[in-house]
């Protein structure tokens, strides 16, 4: 009988390995015992990142990190086995990051980094990046869950030997109504399969994943409407005709050698959603596309003190139909914007690591990106055209191990994010194709036994936050910004079966020159997390405490959000082939807000309402399940 080995990814030794104090990894028991309201909360392993939701379980989440309201992913990029998930020139928002199709059991490890300091992170990575690695195999199982507010989940999966390799497949089906007046009626199906085969040079991995969801979103509502004849409480649904649907398929093949890797992928994506954020003008947004791309990277050891890695990557988005229409109660009224877009990009990068003395490491890298945009109008009176752009992003870093337990870091680099192709070709008010940002940070890492601690102070300057807004099919101006802040993280594993982790982040975001005010709306000023993980032969438990701090709602800081703290817990019992578990989410029934904005709405029967518009945090929720392993 083999003894089970419990692994905590946060406990890995990173002194002499990491290039910056803000880098890290999470895996193993860290993920297995984590209670989750929604799968996007897996990304909250990144210190300071908060994944919220304002429009139903099928829509991409709202992300906060390093003083950014990342909308749905603009400056935070995510990869799964080297395949990018962010969508550029999307029907709702640039860099749209929908991870709802992930099956939690498939994620084995998440490596994360912050800032603009690494050459293999390009578009959408100025705030940070997450690299998810999926499992190679899994014990055969079938399981089911039930919970409050119509939550149901069925899942099954396993691994079988095939042709000298291993074939792993998992599938899940979820339904959920939520606490909303209009039941969400979520119908979610996802499938993931992976074939792994050893080769003479390393390994081959071929993967296929599919995801389909339909839902009826209850969006943010004006707080002034709560308690009136049209809105009984914070869970009211002011437009019950809103609907959403997502279909996504991803196929990929990856070859992994000792000092190189190559990835090819193809994706099909079809999305549409009706929403009514102002409640007097319903819109229908849509996006249908094919994506193809790949990456090749190789490392070279020049001599014992100097190593080099170089890579190329490319991506092509053939967007057949993207835009927005005016609808009323789900019925088409008029088209606002409808385009076909072909967007291609290519990049080449190289990075050198030099260790002149035993305790000192220095890094220098260079990345060059080229983008080509071709926009064709699919209706009259909307702009079309073509444009190309390029950008070069240098990176520098240094790491000094002051002792065996302390390493100091300094990093600097340039990065970028692309803008929506439709805004780039708008002759009236064109946006910049590629927006540059400059980041730097200093930090330290302390590791002693099973305890580690890191501290980082960072700065990030963006030339412009001009962007194309899918809701209105128009360009929204935004001036240059300056951000800075600090991050503290800690992990302690006093015994093999018990671990604690904590993180606290603080940030300050300001416009450089804005007549309406210097404060950046939605820029969270602090966030924190504390966790306990307990894993033994028969029992597992996890506790997560998440704090989301205040942020300005308007540029002059005259209205601000309220802070909120949420506690989630999970417990499980294992016996032979049975695994029984339960999660209690929002343990203390916090009456917070998942998302808050400030703008004018016009609710029928109430007239214009100017002020806070929010979506309530979901109330205390109990879920329980059982898995049978065979």
Predicted regions and their residues:
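N-terminal periplasmic "start-of-domain" segments of outer-membrane beta-barrel proteins
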Residues: 3-34, 59-62
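Extracytoplasmic beta-strand/coil segments of soluble accessory domains associated
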Residues: 8, 23, 40-87
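Short acidic/polar hinge/loop motifs at secondary-structure boundaries
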Residues: 83-114, 132-133
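Short strand-turn segments of transmembrane beta-barrel domains in outer membranes
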Residues: 111-119, 128-160, 170-171, 179-181, ...
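Transmembrane beta-barrel wall of Gram-negative outer-membrane proteins
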Residues: 148-175, 180-218, 241-256, 300-306, ...
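Membrane-embedded beta-barrel scaffold of Gram-negative outer-membrane proteins
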Residues: 254-275, 401, 405-413, 434-496, ...
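Gram-negative outer-membrane beta-barrel transporters
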Residues: 357-362, 370-371, 458-461, 477-555, ...
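C-terminal beta-signal and adjacent terminal beta-strands/loops
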Residues: 500, 547-554, 572-630
């Amino acid at each position: 009988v083999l003894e089970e080995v419990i692994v905590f990814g946060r406990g890995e030794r990173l002194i002499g390995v990491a290039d910056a104090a803000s880098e890290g990894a999470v895996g193993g028991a860290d993920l297995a015992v984590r209670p989750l309201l929604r799968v996007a909360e897996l990304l909250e392993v990144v210190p300071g990142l908060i994944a919220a939701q304002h429009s139903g379980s099928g829509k991409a989440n709202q992300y906060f990190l390093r003083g950014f309201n990342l909308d749905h992913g603009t400056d935070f990029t995510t990869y799964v086995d080297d395949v990018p998930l962010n969508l550029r020139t999307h029907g709702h928002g640039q860099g749209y990051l929908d991870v709802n199709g992930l099956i939690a059991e498939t994620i084995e490890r998440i490596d994360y980094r912050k800032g603009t300091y690494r050459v293999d992170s390009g578009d959408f990575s100025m705030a940070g990046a997450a690299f998810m690695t999926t499992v190679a195999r899994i014990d055969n199982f079938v399981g089911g869950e039930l919970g409050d507010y119509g939550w149901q989940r069925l899942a099954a999966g396993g691994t079988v030997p095939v042709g000298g390799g291993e074939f792993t497949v998992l599938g899940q089906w979820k339904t959920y109504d939520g606490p909303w007046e209009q039941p969400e009626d979520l119908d979610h199906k996802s499938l993931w399969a992976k074939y792994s085969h050893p080769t003479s040079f390393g390994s081959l991995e071929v993967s296929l994943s599919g995801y389909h969801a339909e839902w009826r979103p209850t969006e943010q509502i004006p707080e002034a409407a709560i308690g009136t004849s049209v809105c009984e409480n914070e869970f009211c649904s002011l437009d019950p005709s809103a609907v959403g649907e997502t279909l996504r398929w991803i196929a990929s093949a990856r070859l992994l050698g000792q000092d190189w890797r190559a990835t090819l992928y193809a994706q099909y994506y079809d999305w549409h959603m009706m929403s009514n954020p102002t409640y007097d003008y319903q819109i229908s947004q849509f996006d249908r596309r094919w994506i193809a791309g790949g990456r090749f990277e190789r490392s070279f050891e020049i001599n014992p003190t100097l190593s080099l890695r170089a890579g190329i990557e490319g991506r092509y988005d053939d967007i057949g139909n993207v835009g927005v229409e005016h609808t009323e109660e789900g019925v088409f009224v008029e088209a606002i914007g409808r385009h076909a877009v072909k967007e291609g990009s290519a990049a080449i990068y190289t990075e050198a690591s030099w260790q002149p003395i035993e305790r000192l490491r220095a890094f220098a890298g260079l990345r060059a990106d080229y983008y080509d945009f071709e926009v064709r109008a699919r209706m009259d009176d909307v702009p079309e055209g073509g444009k190309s752009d390029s950008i070069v992003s240098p990176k520098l870093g240094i790491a000094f191990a002051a002792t065996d337990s302390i390493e100091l870091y300094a990093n600097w680099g340039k990065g970028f994010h692309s803008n929506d192709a439709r805004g780039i070709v708008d002759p009236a008010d064109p946006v910049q194709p590629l927006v540059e940002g400059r980041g730097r940070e200093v930090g330290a890492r302390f590791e002693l036994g099973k305890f580690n601690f890191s501290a980082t102070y960072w700065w990030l300057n963006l030339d412009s936050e001009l962007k194309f807004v899918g809701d209105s099919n128009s360009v929204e101006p935004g001036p240059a910004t300056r951000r800075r802040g600090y991050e503290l993280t800690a992990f302690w594993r006093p015994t093999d079966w018990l671990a604690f982790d904590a993180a606290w982040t603080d940030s300050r975001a300001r416009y450089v020159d804005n007549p309406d005010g210097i404060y950046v709306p939605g820029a969270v000023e602090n966030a924190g997390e504390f966790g306990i993980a307990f894993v033994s032969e028969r029992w597992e438990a996890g506790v997560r405490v998440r704090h989301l701090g205040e942020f300005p709602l308007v540029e002059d800081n005259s209205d601000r959000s309220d802070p909120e703290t949420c506690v989630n817990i999970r417990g499980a019992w294992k016996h032979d082939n049975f695994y029984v578990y339960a999660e209690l989410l929002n343990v203390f029934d916090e009456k917070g807000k998942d998302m808050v904005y400030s703008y004018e709405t016009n609710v029928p029967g109430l007239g214009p309402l100017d002020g806070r518009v929010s979506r309530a945090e979901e109330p205390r929720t109990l879920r329980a399940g059982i898995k049978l392993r065979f």
